[in-house]
């Protein structure tokens, strides 16, 4: 192990000098420095980001640099940060370095570990099969279905329900498919991570899930790399065990934000809106590793915070380019009490074609969108002149559109404790069948309110009966 000395510390960025004759560590190598706090030796990991010349490197700290001083000895490990992988990670919670943070026992020293930096699968390793991943959430399965091995973006501003939707997806995949999930918390609230952990523990889902956190209070180095840690764990299940894995990243915007913080400290010129000039490259390196291979698949569902609800911001716009499906959450729908607040017209998926979902599903989805689009166009007339100015056909269409809009809402298992209503999982065939009947006018006489927050159409009829219909 070659060793050097700290020459400069600027927040999370640490310069280390190895001397002009010494062997310099490679880019992305992990360096270790020990600091003494009240007589206790604490290990801090640094990652090499730049080679400055004259035997010096610039590194990013994965932990707080409080207590570090100039002149401290730094050791080169000779390899990248590596994290535990395999069955032992299930039910556990880690940080970016693969250290256990759930209070349980540490991993054995000889536990299998993989480096967090690796190349994306080659072209001939990729799988081209298109298969829909059934989520049991009506609005998603009908209008913007997810593909196995695809990338899904959950777009929405603050507080519209991205994290709750992710929790429900983890629940449904574990309960209905028995699949493995890896949850990666990137720069989000520690409280939410804690709540998610206990909720998953209570529901028994945790046994099929590995959790990795680099939350808001962590230095930017940890927030920038924690997504790679989660991805490395997911890749092992795909490549070695041949599994179909779900990778949840909450929130991909914080990944970009952390990169932006680090970029300025590394001395790079900022790009558009102050973001790092390497934004597209960093996003590409992460996203290209998330894919289906001939061995298995990693399907990723990424919550994407949209700053000030501006979709042209470079961070969400860069993420858009990599996605197969988008689920757009709309604040207007939360104000109407429709949960999940998924915008049925703005959400999209490349899986919504007759070749992938089938002719009937495609036609029902197109008709649902047509009815909702027409209703949207008529809303101005209704607001100014009232319903009486509409033709009889338009009145029928508005009634159906409102029933469809409410029927796209659904009670979630993970929200039972707040709503007092049991959650519902609706198979995709049932979803298509029920919406087809609504479009045919079979339920035109059923009160609109009966369609709110229910599962299949039978729940609507039961609710209507209890309302005295």
From Swiss-Prot:
Its EC number is 7.1.2.2. The keyword Cytoplasm does not apply. The lineage of its organism: Bacteria, Bacillati, Bacillota, Bacilli, Lactobacillales. Keywords: ATP synthesis, ATP-binding, Cell membrane, CF(1), Hydrogen ion transport, Ion transport, Membrane, Nucleotide-binding, Translocase, Transport. One of its GO terms (molecular function) is proton-transporting ATP synthase activity, rotational mechanism. It comes from the Bacteria. Pfam families: ATP-synt_ab (PF00006), ATP-synt_ab_N (PF02874), ATP-synt_VA_C (PF22919). Its main location: membrane. NCBIfam families: atpD. It is a peripheral membrane protein. Produces ATP from ADP in the presence of a proton gradient across the membrane. The catalytic sites are hosted primarily by the beta subunits. Belongs to the ATPase alpha/beta chains family. GO terms for cellular component: plasma membrane; proton-transporting ATP synthase complex. It comes from Lactococcus lactis subsp. lactis (strain IL1403). This is ATP synthase subunit beta. It catalyses: ATP + H2O + 4 H(+)(in) = ADP + phosphate + 5 H(+)(out). ATP binds at residues 156-163. The gene is atpD. F-type ATPases have 2 components, CF(1) - the catalytic core - and CF(0) - the membrane proton channel. CF(1) has five subunits: alpha(3), beta(3), gamma(1), delta(1), epsilon(1). CF(0) has three main subunits: a(1), b(2) and c(9-12). The alpha and beta chains form an alternating ring which encloses part of the gamma chain. CF(1) is attached to CF(0) by a central stalk formed by the gamma and epsilon chains, while a peripheral stalk is formed by the delta and b chains. The keyword Transport applies. It is found in: Cell membrane. InterPro entries: AAA+_ATPase (IPR003593), ATP-synt_VA_C (IPR055190), ATP_synth_F1_bsu (IPR005722), ATPase_a/bsu_AS (IPR020003), ATPase_alpha/beta_chains (IPR050053), ATPase_F1/V1/A1_a/bsu_N (IPR004100), ATPase_F1/V1/A1_a/bsu_N_sf (IPR036121), ATPase_F1/V1/A1_a/bsu_nucl-bd (IPR000194). SMART domains: AAA (SM00382).
């Amino acid at each position: 192990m070659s060793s050097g000395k700290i020459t400069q510390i600027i927040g999370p960025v640490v310069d280390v000098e190895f001397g002009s004759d010494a062997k310099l560590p490679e880019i992305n190598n992990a360096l270790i420095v020990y600091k003494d706090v009240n007589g206790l030796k604490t290990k801090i990991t640094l990652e090499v980001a730049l080679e400055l010349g004259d035997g010096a490197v610039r590194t990013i700290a994965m932990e707080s640099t409080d207590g570090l001083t100039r002149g401290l000895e730094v050791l080169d490990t000779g390899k990248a940060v590596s994290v535990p992988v395999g069955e032992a990670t299930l039910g556990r919670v880690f940080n970016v370095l693969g250290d256990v943070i759930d209070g349980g026992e540490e991993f054995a020293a000889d536990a299998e570990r993989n480096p967090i930096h690796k190349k994306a699968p080659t072209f001939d390793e990729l799988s081209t099969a298109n298969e829909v991943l059934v989520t049991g959430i009506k609005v998603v399965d009908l209008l913007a279905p997810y593909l196995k091995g695809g990338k899904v973006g959950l777009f929405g501003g603050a507080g519209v329900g991205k994290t709750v939707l992710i929790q429900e997806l983890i629940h449904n995949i574990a309960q209905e498919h028995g699949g493995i999930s890896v949850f990666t918390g990137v720069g989000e609230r520690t409280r939410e991570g804690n709540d998610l952990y206990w909720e998953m523990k209570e529901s028994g889902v945790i046994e099929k899930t590995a959790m990795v956190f680099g939350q808001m209070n962590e230095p930017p180095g940890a927030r920038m790399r924690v997504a790679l840690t989660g991805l490395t764990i997911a890749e092992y299940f795909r490549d070695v065990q041949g599994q179909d894995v779900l990778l949840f990243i909450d929130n991909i915007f914080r990944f970009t934000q952390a990169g932006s913080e680090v970029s300025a400290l590394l001395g790079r010129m900022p790009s558009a809106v102050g973001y790092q000039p390497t934004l597209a490259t960093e996003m590409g390196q992460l996203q290209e590793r998330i894919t289906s291979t001939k061995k298995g698949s990693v399907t990723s569902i990424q919550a994407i915070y949209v700053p000030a609800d501006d979709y042209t911001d470079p961070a969400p716009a860069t993420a858009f380019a990599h996605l197969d499906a988008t689920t757009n959450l709309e604040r207007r729908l939360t104000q109407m009490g429709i949960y999940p607040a998924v915008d049925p017209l703005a959400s999209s998926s490349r899986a919504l074609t007759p070749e992938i979902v089938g002719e009937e599903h495609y036609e029902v989805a197109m008709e649902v969108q047509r009815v909702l689009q027409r209703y949207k166009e008529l809303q101005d007339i209704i607001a100014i002149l009232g319903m009486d100015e509409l033709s009889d056909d338009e009145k029928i269409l508005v009634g159906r559109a409102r029933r469809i809009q409410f029927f796209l809402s659904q009670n979630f298992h993970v929200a039972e404790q707040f709503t007092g209503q049991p959650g519902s999982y609706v198979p995709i065939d049932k979803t298509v069948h029920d919406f087809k009947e609504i479009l045919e006018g079979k339920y035109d006489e059923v009160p609109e309110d009966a369609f709110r927050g229910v599962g299949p159409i039978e729940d609507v009829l039961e609710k209507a009966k209890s309302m005295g219909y």
